[in-house]
UniProtKB/Swiss-Prot annotation:
Main localization category: cytoplasm
SUPFAM superfamilies documented for this protein: GlnB-like, Periplasmic binding protein-like II
Species classification: Bacteria, Pseudomonadati, Pseudomonadota, Gammaproteobacteria, Pasteurellales
Family in the record: Belongs to the ATP phosphoribosyltransferase family. Long subfamily.
Keyword Metal-binding: yes
Subcellular location: Cytoplasm
Species per Swiss-Prot/TrEMBL record: Haemophilus influenzae (strain PittEE)
Gene label: hisG
Function noted in UniProt: Catalyzes the condensation of ATP and 5-phosphoribose 1-diphosphate to form N'-(5'-phosphoribosyl)-ATP (PR-ATP). Has a crucial role in the pathway because the rate of histidine biosynthesis seems to be controlled primarily by regulation of HisG enzymatic activity.
Keywords: Amino-acid biosynthesis, ATP-binding, Cytoplasm, Glycosyltransferase, Histidine biosynthesis, Magnesium, Metal-binding, Nucleotide-binding, Transferase
Activity regulation comment: Feedback inhibited by histidine.
Enzymatic reactions: 1-(5-phospho-beta-D-ribosyl)-ATP + diphosphate = 5-phospho-alpha-D-ribose 1-diphosphate + ATP
PANTHER family with a match to the protein in the record: ATP PHOSPHORIBOSYLTRANSFERASE, ATP PHOSPHORIBOSYLTRANSFERASE ATP-PRTASE
Protein name: ATP phosphoribosyltransferase
Amino acid sequence: MTNTTMQPNRLRIALQKKGRLSQDCAILLKQCGVKINWNEQRLIAYAENLPIEILRVRDDDIPGLIFDGVVDLGIIGENVLEEEELGRRAANETVTYKKLRQLDFGDCRLSLAVDRDCHYENVKDLANRRIATSYPYLLKRYMNENGVSFKSCLLNGSVEVAPSAGIAYAICDLVSSGATLEANGLKEVDVIYRSKACLIQRAEPLESTKQALVDKLLTRIQGVQQAAESKYIMLHAPKEKLEKITALLPGVENPTILPLASDTTRVAMHVVSQENLFWETMEQLKEAGASSILVLPIEKMME
């Protein structure tokens, strides 16, 4: 039975309690072999097989928990992290933390948008205009970098309605597909910040057992991400075409070459390769003489 008492020797990780990022974090931990007892009614969860406890909090609370040393690790969108950091620095507060790794989920962009009928050429068109946003510090930095004065209107939700409601001329908000902007009669005109989820650590040194666990998690996360970006490929190749076929398959290491039973002219080739443009690559492999091409997903990798 899992001990659910908060203990100082557990590695404490802050995660968003709801939403897509929360789901992606749960999947990542599972892929890394961390077994968590999730309970939607509880804000603290515990790992069954490792000394880890999860604090499930609001996403905008995670940077502060890291900056203040309350938790050891956090997974957070870079947009939220940088907005909080800029806000604290504007208040002359010291901000220290370690950014360990960018993750392969949580993609979004922070963009400027205006009414679809507005004429817009560049950010200078927003000079002295009122812009509604939930990210005032990221917006201010971008506008300052471009030498544009503006009026900021802070909204913590429903930013898209600001132009139609007469609250602001433009908005600066997170965009994924752009469907919400279109539904509200807006058009995206400038991307000011691109973001992914990232893993961060508090600045104060961890005790050796905790740091060893962090290092173990980092190795596993790297393996999960590399596996997601790669495929295991098996094929048959004429011996005289090996060099040409190998050149078409840039893998993480040299391919494994195996003899084929009762066939002295061909060999079997096994390789881990990137999936990028792989349909085109398969066609090139076939043209080069490869056959019996098999592409398999990889669940885990460790170099």
